[in-house]
Amino acid sequence: MGKKIISAIAAVGLLAAGVYLGSQFGSDNSATIVGGADRYAQKSGATSAAVGSLAKSVGASGKGQVHAVRDGESIQAAVQKAQPGDVIQVYPGTYKETVYIDKDDILLSGVIVDGQWPTMEGGQKLNDAVLYSGNSITVENLHITHYKGNAIMGQAGNNFLIRNNRVIDTGVYGIFPQLGKNGLVSNNVLSGIEDAAIYIGMCDNVHVNNNEVFANVAGIEIENSRHSIVENNKVYNNTGGILAFITPGLPIKTTFDVIIRNNFITDNNHPNFGAPGSIVSGVPAGTGIIVMAADEVTIENNIISGNKNVGIVITDHDSFANITKDPDSDPHSDKVSILNNLMFNNGAEPIDDIKALKIASLTSGPVDIISVGTSRDSCLLNPGQYPSLGTKSFGTCGFSTTADTVTYLLPEPVAPREFKLEEKGKMVYYGVCAGCHAYNMRMIGPPVETIQALYMDNPQGIVDYISNPTKKRDDYPAMPKQDYLSPEIRRAAAEFMLNTDSKGVFHDPALNQQK
C-alpha cells in the first residue's frame, strides 16, 4: 500500500484551508439520477449462479494421487513429488519451511484431527509460508504464524482457492494473490498483520467472502484490481477496514467494478503497529472504508459503526501533494455508489485535519462520509441519510441493489498458459517484483527507477543480490531470498526490470482492459 492512503486522509486539511468549500461541502445534493440496474454487469463474467457453486471454476481438481505429510516430514518434498491433480494432505504437527508450488492443479490441504491443526511456523526467521505460481491451486486448513513476509502469496496463478486458513502474525501480508484471474478467498481468519490481512493485488474476477479480519493495520485491500466482490466479512479492530484504490506506477493501471456489501465494518480503531519507517505506519486509526482513485465502487448493505475517524472516505490522487502521478492512471474516484447501509457512531474522534474541515464548513457532530477532491458521476441512494461532507455533487442512485450480481467468478477455469523464457521473466516481474516495487514511487521496496540507476546494464548483479540479499537500508525491510526461482527465470526477470519504464512495455495493453 502506497503513500496515497496516508495522504488521502490527511489531505482534507488542504480543503479546510478553503478550497472551494462552498461548492463542494454544501448540504444539498444534486437531483441527477445516476446509474442503472445493470451498471456493474459489464464485460466481467458476472453471473447469478447459486452461492453454493462459487468454487466451481476455482481451485484444484483433487482427482490424483494423495501424498500424506506427517509431523517431522517436509511439505515441500511432497510438492516436488506431486503431479498435476494430486492432493497433499498435511497432518497435525509443526512445519518450519517455505512451500513453493510451481505446478498446476495441486490441492494443499491440512488435516484437522481432534481440533489439532497442522501449523506452519516461521519462527520470525522465514519470510513466506506458501508461494504458488501454478494455476488451479487450493490452499486450505492450515494454521500459519510467525513469518516475516507473507502467509500465502500467489504469483500470477489463476483459478486460485484460498479457504479455511488461520493466519496469525505473518509480517507484511496475510493472503496476497498477485496478478491472478478468477479466485476465491473464503472463510479465513487473519490477525496481527503489519500491512494488509487480505491483499488482492492486480487481479481480476475475485470473490472475497466470509473472512474474519481483526487487529491488523489494514483489513481487506482491493488494489489495481477489477471485477471484485467483497462480502459477508467481519472486519473489526483494524487500523483501517476495507480499501479499494489504485497504486500509481504498477503494470495494471485501474481499479473498477468493485462491490463491497453485507460486511460488518466495525470499531476499526486499532493502534497502528506498522513497522517503524514503513508507509503504513502513518495510517491513522478509525476509518471504515477508503476509496481512492477507484471507479465503479458500490457500497451496499454494510454495517459500518464505531469507526472513530470516519465511516467512509472517498478521495483521489489530485487531492494531496508529494505523490508521483501515473499518466496512465485516472486519478479520480468516479461512479462511486453508496446504497443503503447501516451507519452509526462513526467520526466521534476524528483526526485534526477532519476537525479543521468541519470547522471550516460549519459542520457539527460526527460525520459518516467524507468525499475529498473530484468524484464524477457518483451517487447516494438516499441523499441526506448520512451526515456527510463533500458529497454535494453526488446524484441520486438510479438503482438500489447489486443482488442480481452474485459473483464475478468465471463459469469455467482460465485456460493454462505456456510462456517462452522472456515471457516468464515478464510474468515473474509482474507477479512477484511488482508486489513490492512500483515504477516511480515507494512501496515495500524501493522504486524500480532506483534499482535501474543502481544496476543499469548489470542484470547479473540483480540476480546475485536476490539470490542471497542483505539488508542495506534501515528504512526498508529485509528482502527475502528469491532462490526458489530458477537461475534462468531470475535472469529473465532482472533483464525485464532493467528495460521497463512507466509506459511502454510496463503499460501492458494485455493487462489493461477497457471498461
Q: Where are each of the predicted segments found?
A:
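Short, T/G/N/S-enriched strand-turn elements that build extracellular solenoid repeat scaffolds
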Residues: 57-58, 75-82, 96-103, 155, ...
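Acidic Gly/Asp/Thr-rich repetitive segments characteristic of extracellular carbohydrate-active
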Residues: 61-89, 94
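Electrostatic cytochrome c docking/interface patches
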Residues: 68, 410-428, 514-515
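Axial heme c-ligation environment in periplasmic c-type cytochrome domains
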Residues: 443-452, 468-514
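Sequence/structural segment immediately N-terminal to covalent heme-attachment motifs in c-type
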Residues: 420-439, 461
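Right-handed parallel beta-helix/beta-spiral solenoid domain characteristic of secreted/periplasmic
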Residues: 69-73, 105-148
